[in-house]
């Protein structure tokens, strides 16, 4: 029968030794070190070794290694660009020669006329 002390008291655990020892040693009680850190204001005896256990939240558990290579789905992080109709204004230059109704031959350069054209580019 093992006498287990309260977790808040800084006393060591007491347990009987295992059956692998001689019968003379089985009747003796063996003091085990306190593995639970004391949270009370009492000072621990100098003979007890204090080995605090880290809380479970601080323990890192490594992932299981598997022989099979698992394919991780790739996530497309680039956004799809939807084209929208953007009205643009382009200057269209008409370089065609404007001929007047005259029997004379025009030796000058053809006149250029500029018209504003609005189109939608998709």
Swiss-Prot record:
The gene is CSN3. Keywords: Glycoprotein, Milk protein, Phosphoprotein, Secreted. GO terms for cellular component: extracellular space. Its main location: secreted. The modification Phosphothreonine is found at residue 98. Residues 73-89, 111-122 have a biased composition (Polar residues). The record marks 58-59 as: Cleavage. The keyword Phosphoprotein applies. This is Kappa-casein. The keyword Iron-sulfur does not apply.
């Amino acid at each position: 029968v093992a006498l287990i002390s309260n977790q808040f008291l800084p006393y060591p655990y007491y347990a009987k030794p295992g059956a692998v020892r001689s019968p003379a040693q089985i009747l003796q009680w063996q003091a085990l070190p306190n593995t639970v850190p004391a949270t009370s204001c009492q000072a621990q005896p100098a003979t007890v070794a204090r080995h605090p256990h880290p809380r479970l939240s601080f323990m890192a558990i490594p992932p299981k290694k598997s022989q099979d290579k698992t394919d991780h789905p790739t996530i497309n992080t680039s956004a799809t660009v939807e084209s929208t109709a953007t009205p643009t204004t382009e200057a269209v230059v008409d370089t065609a020669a404007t001929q007047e109704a005259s029997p004379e031959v025009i030796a000058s350069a053809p006149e250029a006329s500029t018209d504003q054209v609005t189109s939608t580019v998709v």
